[in-house]
Amino acid sequence: MDIITLLGAICLAYGGMLILYYRLRTTEKRKELSQLMLNGIKNMRRGNLDKALIYFDKAYEYTIETNNREEMADALYNMGIIYKEKGEMNSAMEYLNSAQGVYDELQDKDGSKKVTAATQSIR
């Protein structure tokens, strides 16, 4: 009976450690994602569009890993705006349409409105 109790305690401890590990890992990824988005916005405002694209692209990759749809839509939207500023309208529309799709899935009306305004200014 003591062995069964010991094995049960070990399993519970192991399960607790796994939960703790994944929570810490998720928190780290969220912090990294926030930092990437912030750096992208800073560079976009400073006019460093190519550098901003790199940050937003990395942020987009993180959103796929973490299934963070809200940040995914924002990263796509920002990449669309950058391509618009660079005069690459086809790429801009592609990213903005992708962002629109995610905003629609999330039923984010504010996000949808800003994408609509951006796409109308391209047409």
Each predicted region: which residue ranges?
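TPR/Sel1-like alpha-solenoid repeat signature
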Residues: 36-39, 43, 55, 62, ...
